């Protein structure tokens, strides 16, 4: 039940407290101990992790230490089994990221399927540390067993290739949120940094939102235009998320969420 899940989880795109971390200089020891205690007991979910892309493109194995490893675009890796364990995190949303280039050239759905496959293969390879989760009950059980939940979220709504049937199939495969765009406007939703052509969400885009509500899939408004954010809020009957965005009042960028939307 995704409504229960929305209450249960704490989305934490960046979470610095870890079991193995030493107390920062100048920190209050009592407050630090209390923070660690809360963290250990809480269910903490990271809303967006791009590690499936190098798992697929670079054959990266999660058992390999990530220090000194880099994505093809030069960004450093932050994820491996030992870091997951040290962090005390309950779960990670593995990003099924589909480049906007594939919206233009074709192959978006296949790319999503490839990343879903590589994610499942990783959890099957390391069953002692990882477990695939799709429900709140799964997450609670993983926490109890000391395993990390692997969840999945699609980044780029064009991965469904304008098919509600494909959306339903992705849900059946375990996808539990979808970011409606990435950095390109597509057939039914406008991106934050691209030329709009739908005045927000198209009629079909609103159908997508309603079907995601029916399925129990989170609607993710990271990367979308502010008009899309407001359209989603008008249409959705369920809670929405911004899986990896900040507050625009604190960092004035179109990727971030304005006070008006908040």
Regions found by a protein language model. Give the residues of each.
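Sec-dependent N-terminal signal peptides
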Residues: 5-14
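N-terminal hydrophobic targeting/anchoring segments and the immediately downstream early-domain regions
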Residues: 19-197, 252-262
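Histidine/acidic residue-rich metal-binding segments in metalloenzymes
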Residues: 36, 162-172, 194-241, 254-262
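Histidine-centered catalytic micro-motifs
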Residues: 44-51, 224, 242-245
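Acidic, glycine-rich active-site loops and adjacent beta-strand->loop/helix elements
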Residues: 98, 246-247
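Short, catalytically relevant binding-site loops at active-site mouths
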Residues: 226-227, 247-249
């Amino acid at each position: 039940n995704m409504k229960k899940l929305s209450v249960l989880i704490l989305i934490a795109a960046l979470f610095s407290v870890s079991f193995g971390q030493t107390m920062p200089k100048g920190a209050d020891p009592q407050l630090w101990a209390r923070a660690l205690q809360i963290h250990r007991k809480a269910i903490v979910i990271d809303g967006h992790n791009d590690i499936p892309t190098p798992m697929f493109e670079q054959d990266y194995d999660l058992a390999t230490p990530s220090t000194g490893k880099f994505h093809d675009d030069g960004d450093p890796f932050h994820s491996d089994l030992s870091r997951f364990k040290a962090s005390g995190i309950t779960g990670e949303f593995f990003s099924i990221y589909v480049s906007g280039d594939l919206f233009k050239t074709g192959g978006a759905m296949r790319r999503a399927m490839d990343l879903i496959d590589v994610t499942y293969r990783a959890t099957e390879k390391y069953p002692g540390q990882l477990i695939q989760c799709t429900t709140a009950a799964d997450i609670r059980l993983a926490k109890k067993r000391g395993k990390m939940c692997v969840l999945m979220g699609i980044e780029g709504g064009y991965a469904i290739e304008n098919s509600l049937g494909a959306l339903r199939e992705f849900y059946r495969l375990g996808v539990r949120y979808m970011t409606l765009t990435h950095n390109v406007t597509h057939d039914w939703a406008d991106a934050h940094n691209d030329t709009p052509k739908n005045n927000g969400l198209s009629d079909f885009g609103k159908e997508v939102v309603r079907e995601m509500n029916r399925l129990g899939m989170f609607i993710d408004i990271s990367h979308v235009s502010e008009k899309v954010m407001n359209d989603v809020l008008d249409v959705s009957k369920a809670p929405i998320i911004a899986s990896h965005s900040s507050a625009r009042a604190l960092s004035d960028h179109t990727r971030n969420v304005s006070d008006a939307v908040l």
